[in-house]
Amino acid sequence: MRPLKFGVTEFNQSLAFPSFTLFAPSGGSQCFLIDMLGECRKEWTLPGPLGNYGQLLPNGNLLITVRTSEGPKFNPIGGHILEIDWDGDIIWEHIDHLQHHDFNRLPNGNTTYLSWELIPTEDAEVIGGVAGSEHPDGGIYYDVLREVNADGDMVWEWRMVDHFPFEKYPLRPARPREEYAHANCCFVQPDGNILVSWRDIDLIALIDRKSGEFLWEMQDRRWGGQHDPRQLDNGNITLFANGSEQVGPEYSRVLEIDPNKKEIGWS
């Protein structure tokens, strides 16, 4: 979908941080850089439909994904990670047809991203969900974290099937079993450990890069399918709480969480 008009609903200049906003509309094939007044200052045309996220690198290049047709029929699927310069030229790319949602460029030039792997039904460990709702491909898709170097060689991998405490975090009773838990963010911290968000079970967890085990975890049903947890310089974690599927009125919030107390310090 291409936006018909950019604009600003409300702009309090004294409270807003002066910056640009990178806007990648789902379902489209463009990515836009927007100023504080809502004016488009830069547009990239992608070589296919947008996968999901986009981000600007320190060198000004755009890191983004587009969809491939070979992956499972999920949303939001990507499959093709691209680094595009200011002139629109592709200067790096990597294809993994099971890539989805989030990705990060590391200080060493490597790229970490979320992917899936299909676990056959008879081998899958699944708690909760709707029995018989496994994916038509023949099993359940579990999340995988992968890191590739500039040549596209995989140098590190974390597999959900090897480390995730399934018995502790069952799927909600009405959830299909075609995919387990729906990871949507992988934020790489300065120490290399990775903060991951699983939307369908309202869980965020910090994964130890060396052992693969959880160093810290927090779950709160009131988040209603969170996105984008990130660690601040003070150690706190911000996230976007979608607030969907709530008992009461649905509403979204931005939260700042003290990970030591597991308490909301700001919203």
State what each model feature region is.
Residues M1-S267:
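Histidine-/acidic-rich catalytic cores in large beta-rich domains
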